[in-house]
Amino acid sequence: MAERIPAVTVKTDGRKRRWHQHKVERRNELVDGTIEAIRRHGRFLSMDEIAAEIGVSKTVLYRYFVDKNDLTTAVMMRFTQTTLIPNMIAALSADMDGFELTREIIRVYVETVAAQPEPYRFVMANSSASKSKVIADSERIIARMLAVMLRRRMQEAGMDTGGVEPWAYLIVGGVQLATHSWMSDPRMSSDELIDYLTMLSWSALCGIVEAGGSLEKFREQPHPSPIVPAWGQV
C-alpha cells in the first residue's frame, strides 16, 4: 500500500515554494531598480541613495541583500543573464561568413558592455570574490558557446578540433580584458577597438585554418618572421 503524504506537509511545501518565488521576484525588481538608478545618477550611489531612488527603505534592501557587495554581485548576475548572454547567443547563431561572424561576435560583446557604462563601472569597482565568480562564470559560458560554434564549423570543413576550447577561452578572455581596459580609459572609438580586436582574432583564426587545426602540422611548418612591408615608400 502506498504511503500517504499528510496534507499539511503538501500545503507547507506549497507555501514555501510560493514564498521563495516571491523573494526571487522581489529581489529581481530591486536589482532592476538599482540598475536604473545607477544609469541615471552614476556608479557612486550609496545604499541610502539607491534605496531612495527605488522608493524603499534601506532596511528593505538589507532584507534581500547582505550588503552592498551582495547587491553588486546581483547586478552583475542580472546583467549577464538578461542582456549579455542572450546577446552573445544571438551573435554566435548569426548566419554569416567567417570574417563577418568574427567581427559580429566581438562587436556585440563590446557594444553590450559599452551601452551600460555606469552599471559596468559600478560592478567592476567592487572587488568581492562573489562578483569575480559571476564574471568568471559568464566568461566560461561564452567561451563554451564559442567552442561549440568553432567545433561545428571546423568539423564541417574536416579540420582537427582538438584546440577549440583553449582557442575559445583565449579569444573571450582577450576581448573581455581589452574591453575592460578600454572602458576604464577609452582612448579610441568603439569601432576602432572592435576592428583592432577583429584584426588579431581573424589573423589567428586564419593561421589555425592554414594548419587545418592540427597541432602536428603547425609544429612541422616553418615559422619565419613576417616580412615587414615598407609602408609609405613609393
Curated annotation (Swiss-Prot):
It holds the Pfam family TetR_N. Keywords: DNA-binding, Transcription, Transcription regulation. InterPro entries: Homeodomain-like_sf, HTH-type_TetR-like_transc_reg, HTH_TetR, Tet_transcr_reg_TetR-rel_C_sf, TetR_C_32. This is Uncharacterized HTH-type transcriptional regulator Rv0472c. GO terms for molecular function: DNA-binding transcription factor activity; transcription cis-regulatory region binding. Was identified as a high-confidence drug target. PANTHER family: HTH-TYPE TRANSCRIPTIONAL REGULATOR RUTR (PTHR30055), TRANSCRIPTIONAL REGULATORY PROTEIN (PROBABLY ASNC-FAMILY)-RELATED (PTHR30055:SF160). Residues 46-65 bind DNA. It comes from the Bacteria. GO terms for biological process: regulation of DNA-templated transcription. Residues 24-83 form the HTH tetR-type domain. One of its GO terms (cellular component) is extracellular region. Transmembrane segments: none annotated.
